[in-house]
Amino acid sequence: MRLSVLLLSVLVFFPVFASSAVTEQGTFSQEKHFKGFSKPFISTGSFELAEDGLTWQVESPVKSTLLIKQGQVYTLDDQDKPQLQKGAEPYVNLLQAILKHDEVALAEQFTMTDHAEPGCQTLLPKDDLLKQLFSQFELCEAAEQVSRVRLQEANGNFTVLRFAYPNKEQKQ
């Protein structure tokens, strides 16, 4: 279940730019807020989305790499060899819908509404298994790119992901 939370928190932010065939890359910061703790656990890294998959590299505080290719999820071991992560398969179709910003597929999984904050949407899961993990997602975009995602977990913890695209001029 922990891998499921990680996969969804890592990958839910791709709906806007995944629809293009052009590879997108950038950096991220992820703040994981746990109930009962005053300071969040913060990680930073980089990502690259290409037609053939996604690479998500955490640089700090602990280096790790997550890959999605051909409907499968992998992590890299100490020798940089991909290791299949069993149990992640049920989420690949959902993740692909998010990555492609397939609103028809997303509407099957979520109730989607505009958020009070301009440029943001709230997604409420319909699936019982997904509801056990998350109460809602907030997706925000700026200049046609995902800028922030907030994942509210059912247990009260939440994660905030922020994205930057340093190698791409921001659209006006």
Locate the predicted segments by residue.
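A short, Trp-centered hydrophobic/proline-enriched beta-strand micro-motif
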Residues: S20-S38
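Acidic/charged, solvent-exposed loop-and-adjacent secondary-structure segments enriched in E/D, K/R, S/T
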Residues: L76-L99
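A short, amphipathic edge element
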Residues: H101-T113
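Gly/Pro-enriched, hydrophobic low-complexity segments
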Residues: A116-Q172
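N-terminal signal peptide c-region/cleavage motif recognized by signal peptidases
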Residues: F13-P15
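Sec-dependent signal peptide recognition
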Residues: R2-S9
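Structural recognition of beta-strand segments within beta-rich domains
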Residues: S38-F41, S46-A50, L54-S60, T65-I68, ...
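Beta-turn initiation residues at beta-strand->coil junctions
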Residues: E59-S60, D77-D78, R150-E153
